[in-house]
Every structure is written in C-alpha cells, then in structure tokens.
Regions:
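Glycine/small-residue-rich loop that forms an oxyanion/phosphate-binding "nest" at active or ligand-binding sites
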Residues: 54-113
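Glycine-rich, highly charged phosphate/nucleotide-binding loops
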Residues: 40-57, 164-174
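Internal active-site segments that recognize and position negatively charged phosphoryl groups
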Residues: 114-146
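N-terminal basic/disordered segments at the start of proteins
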Residues: 4-31
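N-terminal beta-loop-helix "entrance" segment that forms/cooperates
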Residues: 26-48, 105, 158-163
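Histidine/lysine/aspartate-rich catalytic loop segments that bind and position anionic ligands
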Residues: 139-169
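A C-terminal functional module that forms or caps the active site or interfaces directly
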Residues: 160-186, 191-207, 212-216
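Short acidic-hydrophobic, aromatic-tinged amphipathic segments that line or gate anion-handling sites
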Residues: 42-46, 106-114, 224-232
C-alpha cells in the first residue's frame, strides 16, 4: 500500500487530511489545535532540518511527500524539496496563487522588514496580521506609533505595542469592529492567498486604508505543483490507484 507524508499548516492541508486514509500521515509543526477526527495518523513536531526529514521518510517507508505548508514557510518548503531528493521520493506542493488587488484597494508591497519599517513611517496605529513575526521587532516601534499585532497567542503588553491572541477564521463584522476599536490607520498583511479574499482586506478597502503587503518568499520548485487542494487531491487519488 502506498503511503504519503503530508506537511500541513493551512486550511487546505487539513481539508486534504480529512480525506486521507490510515496509511498516510498528517504532520504539523505544533502551532494551533491538533484535529482529533482524522482517519489518517497525525504527528506534531519538527524533524531537525532536511536531513532529519529525509531520514524519517526513509525509516517510515513513505512513497510521496506533499508540502501543503503556508506560502511564507519558505524554510519548511526548502527542507521538503531537499528531503524528498535525499530520500528518493517525489515532492508535490500546494502553491496557491496570491490575492490580487481590485478596484478601491491600496496595496503597497514591501520586500522585507527594512522596507516595511520605512513604509510605516507616515502612520500611527498599524495593525499587523503577520502571526508571531512582529514580536521580533517590538523594539523598533517609533515614539509616534502604537502597534497592534494579532497571532494565535496573546503576549504581555510592551511599550507602545499590544498583541492580541485570536484564532481565525474571522467574520466581516468582527473585523469591522476590530478596526474601529483600534482606530488603525494602516493594515500590514501577508499575501497568503486562498479561494476567497480575507475579510480584513475587504474592511481595509471599505475604510480606505492602505495595506502594506509583505512580499512572498521565493519557494523552490517541487516535482509537481498544484494551485488548489482539489487538484492536489485528484492527483493523490490517481497516484494511489496507479
């Protein structure tokens, strides 16, 4: 029986895992809730880099590695491609396209945190929706700014900064209420992409707020790449039956 290792981290990965049988393994880094209703096995934790992942693939006898991690998890994707090559198995990847700005959107892409800090200079109350990443930069908050960040787990208050613990998905009304309560004047976001644009981007459009978009990292090419989960699942079904 063929066996695959699915590296998860986004909603589409969980949707795939729900449709996998007990021969397969769904792997999570450890952030967030672990689903308890899956037919496939679940593993939580890292592997110690590409070499460790390759050894795990070889020891467990997996025939296929599927990378369905977040588009900004560049290191994991790099390790996945390298590990598959070391283990001698194919690596398939879910590479969902990014969101596209539409009428009324004011999106401004920045390449890295240096550009982001510079682009934030005219604003006073930015809202960061970058996960835990802003926590590493709280020492850079200028005197005229107050930062609010949102991630899975809240953090103790810092000078001129607040970190809210919240788990999505978020409703449109909830995002409107949050933006109004915070009186934010700019949104900082990743271009994560998905089938639907997130409510926070719609609220920014409604309120006429600019969105500073942290550019996607370059990802290594996989043996096969898929733009959506359904196409990936269809390929897995074909692979299982071949």
């Amino acid at each position: 029986m063929k066996r695959l290792l699915l590296l998860g981290g986004i909603g589409e990965a969980l949707a795939l895992a729900r449709r996998l049988g007990p021969a397969h393994l769904y792997s999570l880094a450890g952030l967030g809730k672990v689903p308890g209703d899956l037919a496939c096995r679940v593993r939580v934790g890292g592997y110690g880099g590409a070499e460790g992942l390759a050894a795990f693939i070889d020891e467990q006898g997996f025939d296929l590695l599927v990378d369905a991690t977040h588009p900004y998890a560049a290191r994991i994707s790099q390790n996945a491609v390298r590990a598959a090559r070391l283990a001698g198995v194919p690596c398939w990847a879910l590479r969902r396209p990014g969101w596209q700005a539409g009428p009324g959107d004011d999106w401004r892409e920045v390449a890295d945190w240096r550009e982001l800090i510079a682009a934030l200079a005219p604003f006073r109350r930015p809202l960061f929706t970058l996960g835990r990443e802003p926590l590493e930069h709280l020492g850079q908050v200028p005197p005229h700014q107050h930062w609010t960040g949102r991630c899975l787990q809240g953090q103790p208050a810092a000078p001129r900064a607040e970190v809210i613990g919240a788990r999505g998905p978020f409703s449109l009304d909830g995002e409107r209420a949050l933006f109004e309560r915070l009186a934010c004047d700019v949104l900082v976001s990743k271009n994560s992409g998905s089938q639907a644009t997130e409510p926070k981007l719609q609220v920014a459009r409604e309120m006429g707020l600019p969105v500073l978009v942290l550019a996607r990292p370059a990802l290594p090419p996989a043996d096969r790449e898929f733009a959506d989960g359904e196409a990936l699942l269809a390929a897995i079904r074909d692979w299982e039956s071949a």
